[in-house]
Amino acid sequence: MEIQGTRFGTLEFDEKEIIYLNEGLLGFPLSKQFLMFPYGEDSSFFWLQSVDEPEIAFIVINPFDFFSDLEFAVEDEDASSLVLARSEDVEIFTLVTIPEGRPEEMRTNLAGPVVVNVQNRLGKQILCKDYSPRQPLIPDSMRSQLKEQARSSKGGHVAGGR
């Protein structure tokens, strides 16, 4: 199978690679089939590419790579709809937003993780009221350093003169 996307051009894939989000994502109810692939080599980021609407792609992460103390509770109803039998069959991803020109301010939506049953490729975005929908990925101390580095590299120095 293949899709023609605006971001990646032609993507060839096998049907068994599709993740099925039968309820779509919040704000994107028509996108129900997705492909997921690494953002880059050795990256903690992934692309979640809509098969139904090829112009739509999201950056996602495994939030446990960034926040070791997270605990997401999958309600029985959600587990049932995903046909989850074992916790080992679950992978969880969160959507990332990166403000244009301000990557140091990237955030992830911990309040709306996407839960995927890796055995049957069924997924669902669930709601977690205990977490922020705009959780910074970069600690405040590092953000300040990155902003300062960006400012100094933009400003540059003019040499010469009389």
Swiss-Prot record:
Signal peptide span: none
Annotated compartments: Cytoplasm
Protein name: Flagellar assembly factor FliW
Any Pfam family hit: FliW
InterPro entries attached to this UniProt entry: Flagellar_assembly_factor_FliW, Flagellar_assmbl_FliW_dom_sf
Family to which the UniProt record says this protein belongs: Belongs to the FliW family.
Key words of the record: Bacterial flagellum biogenesis, Chaperone, Cytoplasm, Translation regulation
Gene giving rise to this polypeptide: fliW
Assembly and oligomerization: Interacts with translational regulator CsrA and flagellin(s).
GO CC annotations, alphabetized: cytoplasm
Gene Ontology biological process terms in this record: bacterial-type flagellum assembly; regulation of translation
Matches recorded under SUPFAM superfamilies: BH3618-like (SSF141457)
Family matches, as HAMAP family: FliW
Function: Acts as an anti-CsrA protein, binds CsrA and prevents it from repressing translation of its target genes, one of which is flagellin. Binds to flagellin and participates in the assembly of the flagellum.
